[in-house]
Amino acid sequence: MSNLRFRCLVDSDFCDIAPFEPYIEKGSLDMGLALIAFDESELDTIKNLLKEAQLEGSNGYLYILSQGSIEKKGKMPNSITKAYRYYKRYKKKQNRAAAHIEKELSHSGDGIKKVSGGRFSAYKYTDRENKMCFPFRLRASKNKNKPLFILLHGAGAMGSDNFKQLFDNIPLYKQLLKTDCNILLPQAPFGSNRGESMQNYIKSIKRLVDELPADFDRKRIYIIGTSFGGCCVWQLVYLFPEYFAAAVPVMGGLCLDCDYEKYDIGRLVKTPIWAAHSSDDTNVKIDSDDYYAAELKKLGADIKYTRWDKYGHTMSGKFYRTEKGADGV
């Protein structure tokens, strides 16, 4: 079901169905040929919109597309209604975040602005080229030429408070705080975990690192990410080969739609990678990590792969506590 698309007729926007899977009862949709309509009067509209198998979002009726005709299957399962309500709340937050970024771009100049000091100083970064504005925290070493660790949070810590990302992976922070290093903690704007917004955020992270005021060793830039952050790590390593000294993507993936041929795997060979995932993860499927770990090993790349069969999408805490990924890089 994760390869389906969820479409809302209100704003004709698309997003992956994955966030809604917990709300959808098993067996309520099959074969990826389901759609949802407000009522029967909108059936013609839906037929015109359907170019491929996809979900249509509402709280009305459930239909099955079959051989060019649409068969009504009765009222919507309650779980789908919950998914649609969740989607509406999500879109409201996403639109509010987009409006905030647009406002900031119109009032702020490019670059880094310090907001407050402290152990983890607070900053705001504006990148007009990539239409992105987000807060970040920086713990700068008192000594020069120390390594930089970039920690990318999961989707649950998205926002603009410059606070939630501090608590995304406590076991990892405990490791790093014992070492003399620089730590960068960006906070992704709400809704920047998909599509063009995600790509803009990823490019902005690299640009931010280039402009950081900290005097760190630019040959020792390490990047670690969890879930959405793990996906960002894969993308950054792919887009900027040889930029990072090493990368640790946890519960992420480079190619979640499994269209592996669109990526030149040779670009990944240039960066040492330690990937970690669990086979029972239902939020971010393990397929992409399985594929690239195997292919990179065939190419003789510096790749380490921690693959577990339990803990699901909560494996990161256990991984950081027991495997000590920060020590490994």
Where are these regions (language model features)?
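N-terminal accessory nucleic-acid engagement/regulatory domains that precede
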Residues: M1-Y63
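A domain-start/cap signature at the N-terminus of enzymes
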Residues: L50-A53, L62, I70, G74-L148, ...
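Active-site machinery of serine-nucleophile hydrolases
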Residues: L148, L152-K203
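The conserved beta1-alpha1 loop
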Residues: L152-G154, M251, H277
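Gly/Ser-rich "nucleophile elbow"/oxyanion-hole loop immediately N-terminal to the catalytic nucleophile
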Residues: N193-S227
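Primarily recognizes the serine-hydrolase "nucleophile elbow" in alpha/beta-hydrolase
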Residues: K219-R267
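Catalytic His-Asp charge-relay segment
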Residues: K270-H277
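C-terminal catalytic histidine-bearing segment of alpha/beta-hydrolase fold enzymes
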Residues: A276, T282, D287-A293, K297-V329
